[in-house]
Amino acid sequence: PPIHDFTITSTDGTDVTADVLQMENVFLLVAYDINKSDKSVQGQVNDFVSLCQKAGVEFIGLTSSAPKEVESFRHEHNSGFEYYFTDGTTLKTMIRSNPGLMLLKKGKVEGMWHYNDFPTFDEVKSHYLK
């Protein structure tokens, strides 16, 4: 069924929802409130992102935090990926973890992980990216 009231926008307000949902594979790091996000996993996230980039797999962040807060967070944690913006209630409904990781294949949820259970890239590659 179609998803209603779900939008992903860029910093400049451009709606990129359709683009994201059409991607072959895309990881979404969902952090509904970036300031309350568990920061202890950022090193692991950055390593995962690096491996995604080497393998040509898309990786983006989704948050409802203000753009200035996001830029400050990205700079502080050397995040090598872009954050996009979605309603906070929608993000909490998607995954009950801050942050949480989701894998979409052409808009279909293939995997979801709480930050305590983030997989390694090799695990994901062997199970989901065939």
Predicted regions and their residues:
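Short active-site neighborhood of thiol/selenol oxidoreductases, capturing the structured segment around
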Residues: H4-T9, V16-S37
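Structural motif
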Residues: V30-I34, T63-S65, H114-Y115
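Thiol-/selenol-based redox modules, centered on thioredoxin-like
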Residues: K108-K130
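Short, internal strand/loop/helix patches
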Residues: F59-L62, H75-N98
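Structural beta-sheet core signal
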Residues: F27-L29, G61, L103
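Structural microenvironment flanking redox-active thiols in thiol-disulfide oxidoreductases
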Residues: S37-R74
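A short, hydrophobic beta-strand/beta-hairpin element that forms part of a small beta-sheet core
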Residues: F6, P99-W113
